[in-house]
Amino acid sequence: MDKYKVVIVDDDDVALENLSFELWKDARFSLEGTARNGRKGKKLIMKVQPDLLFLDVEMPDMTGLELLQEIRDYV
């Protein structure tokens, strides 16, 4: 079985590190990349086309919900 491709977008370094570590321990997931803001996250998501997204709701440039609205027609 193929691994689930995962992308994390979060501006909190601790949350990003902890979630990345937990995903790294689980053989079902492949962490394809991380981004620290919505703008970079959008580029990464469009490139990777992940199976699973972890998005921070509150980020300085764009909320997780705004990011979802921008990518929903492309992934």
Task: Outline where the language-model segments fall.
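Conserved acidic segment of CheY-like receiver
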Residues: 3-14, 19-23
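Receiver (REC) domain active-site loop signature in two-component systems and cognate sites
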Residues: 57-59
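Acidic catalytic/metal-coordinating carboxylates
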Residues: 37-40, 63-66
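Active-site beta3 strand of CheY-like receiver
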Residues: 48-54
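Short hydrophobic/Thr-rich beta-strand motif most characteristic of the beta2 strand and flanking loop
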Residues: 28-36, 44
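Conserved phosphotransfer cores of two-component systems
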Residues: 46-48, 70-75
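Alpha-helical elements of the RecA-like P-loop NTPase motor core of helicases
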Residues: 17, 42-43, 69
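Conserved sequence signature across two-component system core domains
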Residues: 9-10, 35, 53
